[in-house]
Amino acid sequence: MAIFGAIADDFTGATDLAGLLARSGAKVSLRIGVPEGDESDAPFEVVALKIRTAPVSEAVSEALTALDWLRGTGAERFFWKYCSTFDSTAQGNIGPVAEALMAALGAERTVYCPAFPENGRSVFMGNLFVGQQPLAESPMKDHPLTPMRDSNLMRLLAPQVTREVGLVDRLTVARGAEALAEALAQAPAHVVVDAVADADLEVIARAGRDMALMTGGSALAMPLPALYREAGLLDDSAREATVAQVGPGAVVLSGSCSAMTRAQVAAYGGPAFRLDPLVLAAEGHGAASNWLARQDMGKAPIIYATAEPEAVRRAQGELGTGRAGEVVETALAALAVQARDQGARRIVVAGGETSGAVTKALGVSRLDVGREIAPGVPWCGCVSGGQEIALALKSGNFGRESFFADALGMLA
């Protein structure tokens, strides 16, 4: 029976959240899409959806369906997880989904805190920073799907919601959970909360522990297992997060065009094939498939569509933003299945949209969360095509430059 249910707007975000919760030693179950039955054998349930860039009506519908399933598992506290770089424009769905979940749960207010200090994301006076750069001055300003041109979370959120947006700043958070709880009780429906360090997140989580709904990045949920144990909602038993031993074959698939993923692709030393969206649109992925068929999975080849911003803009200009992403996702999803059939048992995927497409193509419905490769990126165990598979789903900007080699080395 679950005590906590989370809805994540993409697959890498779901594994990020599940990995941080699993640090506590509690069992975490990660579902790919909404399951059909209500059975749960874990206190923490995370449902991964693929709605980050979905139209508002579609995103709200899927999130409410996930909420209904999570309530059926016994969960009474819920979390709406989105990216630590917010990744949402004025037409985005973060606010509408939050309002729909609030209405379904009868919640008067909720908090918004995408901060993830361990990965360099912080919120100060309502402004989101990536490292020392305001969000709008960071590489996220050139994100191909959700270019972030404003750093102020209140301004980003206000056009998306129908009720007032407010701020509880770092000065209040620094006074502790009791002071924060008092401030939240007087705040409007949608409350952005500052956090610049993990200690701030613990204060926010403690103040909001009994809220029906909290929203934010994965790091905001990280203190919750300890708080639930403290309140007697979770037992003291702990387990080591592990993934079953799998075969030696491996493949790396990268659809992200983030600055960090570009550096990771450049640093990787395995056999490589680059996908060009314009070629994929005209000719399909036959050339990549033929190349992959000749590869030794023991050498962990990489297939990537990762490119510089100018190349991305050129492809989007000729194909349209949606089509440019679709041809890449379709190709990488098909190539993931081919690689599995050729013996790849460790599959590393970079990019949220790509991870969603690959996971669905592999027919994965549940992931068991294992050890973290980097903060927010765990190895996960699953079954695909009757085979035990280890899957790592990486958000574009996560990990250091050697991430791909680090990941494969961990399960060598």
Model-based region annotation:
Residues 3-8, 45-53, 76-87, 194, ...:
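Short glycine-rich or small-residue beta-strand-to-loop segments that form or flank ligand, phosphate
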Residues 1-5, 31, 43, 59, ...:
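Cap/lid and interdomain-hinge subdomains that line or gate substrate/regulatory clefts
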Residues 344, 355-403:
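Conserved, well-ordered active-site substructure
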Residues 17-19, 90-94, 121-129, 179, ...:
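Short acidic, glycine/serine/threonine-rich loops at helix termini
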Residues 34-35, 55-70, 328-331:
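Glycine-rich, highly charged phosphate/nucleotide-binding loops
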Residues 299-350:
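C-terminal structural cap/anchor segments
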Residues 40-51, 298-299, 381-412:
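A structural-propensity feature for long, helix-poor, extended segments
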Residues 131-290:
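Conserved, well-structured core segments that form the ligand-binding/active-site neighborhood
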